[in-house]
Structures are given as C-alpha cells and as structure tokens.
Amino acid sequence: KELLKHVLHQIAVRQLYLQPGITAKTLQEELHVPASLFGTHFKEQTGHSFSEHINKLRMDYAAKLLTEYPQYTIDAIAKMCGIDSRQHFHRLFSEYFGITPSAFRKNHLSSDNKDIKQ
C-alpha cells in the first residue's frame, strides 16, 4: 500500500502521465517497482486501472490548459498531455467531460467573461 502511494506520488509530482505512450511496464522499469503493482492491486487501491488513472490525470491537465491558455491550439494541448492523435484526444476528453475540448473551452471562457462584466 505504501509502495503504491509512492508510485502515485511520483506519477503526479514528476508529471509522468504526460509521457506519450507511457505504459505500466515502462513506469515499473523507471520507478523500479514490481510489475504486479500495476494489475489488480492498482485497481483495488485506486478504483481505476493504470491506463484509466493516466487518462484521468491527462484530461484534468487538458482542462486546465484549455482554460488557462486559450492561445494554445487543441492539437498542441493534446500533445502537451502526451496524446499524439487528435481523434484519440477528442474521444477521451468527450468521454471524460461529456463535451468536446472546443466546447469546453468556449463554455469556460464565456463564463469567465460573464464574471468580469458583473
């Protein structure tokens, strides 16, 4: 349990989730932890599979970039989040937030403008 906490901390602090193509195997090798940590044990402790956890972190980061850096293109943000395919990024984002990245940005920016006008 403590080892998994350490791994989750390393993933977050070092932003390892932003590495394109990151897998449980590459992370296991990089952090020198047993491969078994990323299977059933990971899901039991976090409620998500390893890939679901990585995607959640990526989508949270994408949402932050979309709202804080409106000058960045959607493709640039996808790449910054470790996702090379525009289609894959759109699918993941839409599954996670129920809205496209462009609509998310537009909604957030228009709500920010309403706050400023009041």
PLM region spans:
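Basic, amphipathic alpha-helical hairpins
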Residues: 5-22, 42, 46, 63-72, ...
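Recognition helices and adjacent regulatory flanks at domain boundaries
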Residues: 12-14, 37, 91-92, 107
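Append "Primarily bacterial transcriptional regulators
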Residues: 22-34, 38, 42, 76-84, ...
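Terminal helix-turn-helix DNA-binding modules in bacterial transcription factors
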Residues: 44-84, 106-118
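Helix-turn-helix/homeodomain-like alpha-helical modules used for DNA recognition
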Residues: 87-105, 118
